[in-house]
């Protein structure tokens, strides 16, 4: 099983689905890892009746997070067209780090 699947949307935005993790508790665990390991300057999330939407901002780079995706799993979302190649690489590395840590802490 892949740790995550990456999808390019019609306008070039990237959606990264975290394989095997869904719902609120997994989302909270993911955000705890983001705060502890990535150490963003700012992060947060809000809960409504449909999903949890969140974000983190590090080095001036915004990455959005969600518990809602095509498969109702955890996801990351970012727009590489508005970023340098170096910033895109940072995001890819952050996602890889968070997802590996999530699998280590909550194996499935």
Q: What are the functions of these language-model segments?
A:
Residues 1-49:
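Negatively charged, low-complexity tracts enriched in Asp/Glu with abundant Ser/Thr
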Residues 12-21, 54-57, 76-78:
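Generic recognition of long tandem-repeat/solenoid scaffolds
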Residues 33-35, 57, 73, 80-82, ...:
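General N-terminal targeting signals
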Residues 41-43, 50-56, 78, 99-106:
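Low-complexity, flexible helical/coil segments
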Residues 43-72:
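Short, intrinsically disordered low-complexity segments
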Residues 63-89:
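Intrinsically disordered, low-complexity regulatory segments enriched in Ser/Thr/Pro
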Residues 82-108:
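Mixed-charge, Lys/Arg-enriched low-complexity segments
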